[in-house]
UniProtKB/Swiss-Prot annotation:
Protein known as: Lysine biosynthesis regulatory protein LYS14
Chain intervals with Polar residues compositional bias: 75-113, 120-142
Source organism (scientific name): Saccharomyces cerevisiae (strain ATCC 204508 / S288c)
Additional remarks: Present with 450 molecules/cell in log phase SD medium.
Ranges of the DNA-binding region feature: 159-186
Keyword Zinc: yes
Ranges of compositional bias, category Low complexity: 35-47
InterPro entries the UniProt entry points to: Fun_TF, Zn2-C6_fun-type_DNA-bd_sf, Zn2Cys6_DnaBD
Residue ranges of the region described as Disordered: 1-50, 72-157, 195-258
Amino acid sequence: MFESVNLDENSPEDRELAKVLSPPGSYLSPASLDSGSSFTNSGTSTSCFEPKNNLPSLSFLNARAGSLGGIFNHKQMTSPSNSNIGGENVESTTSSNDGSNENAGHPTTSEQDQNADHPTISQADDNGHSSLTPNPAVTSTVTDKKGNTVKRKYSRNGCSECKRRRMKCDETKPTCWQCARLNRQCVYVLNPKNKKRRTSNAQRVKEFRKHSTSLDNDHNNARKRQHSSCKAEKKKKVRQNLSEDTTDPKPITDNGKNVPLDEIESLEIPNLDLTTTMNGYDVNLLMQNLNDMVNMKLHDSYLLNEELKGLDLPDLDIPELLPASNVNSSVPISFLVNNVITFNTKLSSFKLGGIHDKYLKIFYYDCLDSIAPFFQNQGNPLRDILLSFAKNEAYLLSSILATGASIAYRKSNNLEDERNYCAYLSHCLSLLGEQFKNESNVLNRIEPIILTVIMLAWDCIYSMNSQWRSHLKGVTDLFKKINAGNSSKVLNVAKCWFKVMETFASISTVFGGSLIDNNDLDAIFDPYDYQYVDSLKFLNIMTPLNEFNLLRGHKEDFDLVIKEVFKSLNTIRSTEKNYFSKEEGLFTKKLDYLLLSSQTSSEKSKDQISYFNTQKILVEIDKQLDYEFIDKSGIIPSDNQSHPRISNIHDNAIDMVTLKNGEEVAISWYDISHQTQVLSFLLIVLLKLLGMPKESSTIQQVVKKIMSFFKFLDSDSPPQNSRTCYSNFAVLIAGLNAMDEETRAIVKRYYKINGGKFQKLTEHNLNRLEKVWYGKNQNYRLEEQDVLTW
């Protein structure tokens, strides 16, 4: 049985399949479990990503990699625009002078960026002398537009330590270069007399982000406070708070491991000024989307449940939840006020009482386990972010409870659950109307608002409602504006979650996802967005060695394939509109949408899709199929060092299965998830872009290759978990194209074992398969096919 799981790589079928893919060449080599890794951007390899905090390792590969602190360096990235301020060009020059001037020992502009995140701890005496001093021959000069040397401005706002030692301070926050070099405590005291000196916009934003948590110490007062739209008053208030914030920073700890705050460079707030990034249109559109989505869900609920119309909604008394006063195991990963995320949030930390606890428990386990199955029974960063914000934002908590009630209703069909679901949504709607009349309030709550929108959209998908696309316009516009270099960790996690929905919507539904424009796809599906990758690695959502995305179930640079396939599919969809009857809403081609190719849909689409571009997609798919996380066959050899019997590591990445013949095998979910998703895209390319018939041997080889990963289901006790969700679409499209009964039998067994968690979706897809296999009731309605398979 073990032999049958692996396809013979030297078989004639595989050689024929290889002809469809790219010719042999110089491909990206798959990262190995034991190899070092570095993030490459535009051909430049950097040894970045090394967070100084000690977050618990959440994945199998992280456990193999050891301490995260020794693998990657998480440093703050600043936008390139900050290097040119006020028309002055900052350049680094080399001088033979040994440095008797005031700049001796001071780092260059480029060195400041590096050294600020890599402080060198050295032994120094009271006079500041150290054996590890920077090269005094390197100086930094400032020139005007004509190239003339301009005298430096006096450092009036330097830290107190540099002033005490009468040394020039580079004013780097939170720790200047001198204090970092000498391991001194760096404290900034704002001098009101220097207020008239104008600082750069980037510096003001950085100061605001660094100390903004002091603005809202009292959460109840913060809710009632009306934000002023005047920037001058806002800056004045920030400065007043900064003048009082001179106490020593308390250490932030996680799981008992002390990490001094002044040593955590990765907690530096991202370089983002929302007042310049977002405008009134963005704010109004985002709030309108959220309002429309809540109203849509209420309308659908009343439409489907006539009994609710005569019932009054219950008056839900949701208690106010204040953030925990203890800062232990909390890390600020947002650029806004009071946004501190508590890791490993326990369900017991919420004391809601009554029916609220029931729905919160359903959300905590059922919903989040289906959204992020690789984090099941482990620390879940997405859960921590949602629940940390929910303690401060009542509208987000209401939407969380509404999602729990929605799941409970689908399980029990109890009208009381649906009634409470509507009540939570109404409560959420009223809170939104109260809190966000002022535009500045929206700006200060932009992250929880986006999380609320995405979560309600997810519930639409979960309930097989296809009206969610139009309500994500505000979110997609924001993601386009907040991209590489100026985002926050929370927004990057939200973007990652959004990309999960967008990926499966674009390949599994009739109308595709919410992104239509090619530029939008390039901006959002960018695997080389360094801050996005950096954020996910910091939160253990992406493994540091192989960059396996635990929230999306594949290697991150698979986005190179995803966005190009989406562009071609959008081209096909734009020409398929002629095949939809506006009056009847029927699909005029008597064929399942996933079987409709560009060759059978329209002559125009054949002309618009470039074969050479498709060939590039096939080359990249071949690279992706060559990646190996543990073993790309999906079955871990018994002598592999990652086998549980050798490594003694038990994780969601691996399951042990005893087959009916008595053989025990270890399966790698990382490889199964990645390989099946890549193969499903290969089928899309072959069927819909190249127009190959399903009867061809090439298509049948890919179909059998997909289903070969699930021969372990031939067991009396096969694994049942949500990690198969990443393979659901691959199994569906393989089943639709399967010609032999043996392969179809594996598809049926897959749905029988794994269909319990998505019962409604499973029944829907099995019905589609029956129509294709046996021609039963071939009435292909458009609305029946516009369902996201997840």
